[in-house]
């Protein structure tokens, strides 16, 4: 299982890697094919199938502890993939286990199996969720490009990995991916090593930093082959430029702050310079992987490794120009790491507060020195400066690492080592490019800028760095000592500071790109020193800072201008100063002035500008907010004298006023008068409301009637209610004939044909009476009801008169429904009794209630028909009249009865049981009144039919 877990984790990490790869879409599909195959197979088994399909584990050679593998006591018979265990508490289909087949032993009574404490789906998704980034192209990439995944090791994987590292946020996976990329780059030369790396990357992704360390070292091994990589560098650089991840740096770490925005636009990756840039960006990527954790910005920065540096983290560096500075720093760090610790580094690191950074920086410094020596463009002083910047960077990195997981540290270290080797190669390439670049326009290539700048900067830096690094060592402000020095140290420092938490844009801005960027750094420093006159540089720096701040806020904008783009990199100390913003920034300026007094004005001024910009880049929003607050306080103090009243007093005053006003209002409150006020409109409103409440069922009708009649008069309301109920009854009758339900009810009722006959006669009478009433009521409420009432009279009359037809439609229907209803009547009976036939029936709001449930109504009708029940309903409803249980009484009084009462006896019914009736209307009426149009009519029909049947 451990193996499977490893493969799982490996595949998972590789999958995420794959996703990043597929996202970044390296151009080379798969360069390391052999590796691709071996790895592909593993991955295919572990990750690919897994990522995508829920195919049974047994089918996959995967050893992942899939919940449905036999291993977890599961019978084959249930099918591997079936959620076999976990049958639930009452295990239906008892998979096995005793008890309730709830299972003992591994089958815990707790429904989950021993291992399957999680359902396979859940378990899978659990194991899978990290792994299965199906949303991320990775899983797809995995399954789609198994080979590609190995080819991931190839260029695609390298750029993808770069992008992976860039989205260091994807951290370990991406880290491993990046390392895989580097290893795959190397792996083109040495696929075996790459394979190990890939495997290790998997394991490492799981193991975290440890694996990354391994990967780093492995990657470092191939890194020396970076020449091959360098050759592919251009494409890689373009890839890295292309790779979305790289472009969208994981804003993972403040390091991104190192955003010396390179002037050269992202396009700068010219094929030739591009390889160095791509190397730089790769280093940046590696560094991103290593230091990218520190600053996701670096990732973005390398992304644009050839492009501008990404703005500081504060400004969304995510898409800032590649953190070439970061990449540079990282590469230098890695180089330094590859080299042993350097005395300079040590010194600087000692000065640096972070201890972790110290060792790394020493290593990086040495590596940088070696690189610089290899480059030859830079003197030892430059090397010192560069390595020192790395040292600060590593210091800053390390604090950041401290915040980050050990994996990141390990990855970073490995990457630094890797990058150190790679950067050495890169530096060699860069030196070549430098010599070219110095001659070539700065815009043509960043390395060219760097060469030019470095040519000048090397001298300046050598001088200033050699002399001033000590001063920088002396003070962290001194770390800013040389602009060039500071540019690079600032890359480190800004990372440091950002890691330290300053995360200031300026720090990030000052950060430079990788070795190319290092050159750029030198170039920028030189530019700032030599190209721009100090004043111009200051202004430019400020402009840049402003623009960088803007860009920082926005996505990275490359300063295409060639102005010195040195953004203030804040040393952690500066950071400390700058965080307090004003004071620290000023202190920083002072320190810088003192430290850089030897420096050229340009550098100093750029630093000064950067200090200012550091303040501004502290975060424009921060500064702005501070500024606003200051203004507000100033204005308040000077222009708005305080009344001397405390907030408590002030609000108490308001509260008192409010209470007094409220009391006054309450005394005079017209609302009360309105309540008391008795006006037709009020009654209309109240009456309608009450009516609706009372008989929402009828309200459809009653409300209409009320509106149509004079809703103002309560008496009218009462009459209207009666009329509406009558109408409802009439409607019910007419609708009974019309309604299939009603007809079915009629049939139910017609089960007792005697009742039918009675009903017919009664209904004729009812209808005639109802007609008169409904006509009167319709005259009162002519609108909807009048036609209905008239309709009813006519239809009812026809039905009543043609009792056979009427009864047939109703009663025939009733006959049919009768049996059904009677079948339902058992229910209906229960219902009615349960429902309280008394209420429901008397009002036929019972029916109405049932009408809300027509089935119930039908049943209730049956019950009502049932002489047994009807008498009861009589008793309940017509407490007096209806107590006569005889059908005769029903016939005679049935009209007065609840159903018919709506017709004629309605008034009597109301009188006899007015409160119950109204209560019904209120209760059941609410449900049913609206239904009353149909169901209400049905109810009335039911009532009528019930009454006749009762009769």
From Swiss-Prot:
Presence of keyword Cell membrane? no
GO cellular component terms, A-Z = mediator complex
**Bias regions of kind Basic and acidic residues — which residues?**
58-75, 144-155, 167-188, 347-387, 411-449, 460-483, 490-518, 537-547, 661-677, 688-758, 877-891
Instruction: Classify the main location.
Output: nucleus
Q: Name the residue ranges with Acidic residues bias.
A: 926-936
Instruction: Give a yes or no for keyword ATP-binding in this entry.
Output: yes
The molecular function terms of the Gene Ontology recorded here are: ATP binding; DNA binding; transcription coregulator activity
Q: Where is the composition biased (Pro residues)?
A: 266-276
Q: Where in the cell is it found?
A: Nucleus
Q: Where is this region: Disordered?
A: 1-94, 117-558, 661-951
User: Could you name the domain of life of the organism this protein comes from?
Assistant: Eukaryota
* UniProt biased composition (Basic residues): 14-51, 121-143, 759-772
Q: Where is the composition biased (Low complexity)?
A: 1-13, 82-94, 157-166, 305-322, 337-346, 548-558, 776-786, 844-854
Where does the UniProt annotation place the signal sequence?
A: none
Q: What keywords is this UniProt entry annotated with?
A: Activator, ATP-binding, Biological rhythms, Developmental protein, mRNA processing, mRNA splicing, Nucleotide-binding, Nucleus, Receptor, Transcription, Transcription regulation
State where composition is biased (Polar residues).
204-220
Q: How does it assemble?
A: Associated with the large multiprotein complex TRAP (Mediator complex-like).
PANTHER family this protein is in?
Answer: THRAP3/BCLAF1, THYROID HORMONE RECEPTOR-ASSOCIATED PROTEIN 3
Q: Its biological function?
A: Involved in pre-mRNA splicing. Involved in nuclear mRNA decay. Initially thought to play a role in transcriptional coactivation through its association with the TRAP complex; however, it is not regarded as a stable Mediator complex subunit. May play a role in the positive regulation of the circadian clock.
Q: What is this protein called?
A: Thyroid hormone receptor-associated protein 3
- What organism is the protein native to? Xenopus laevis
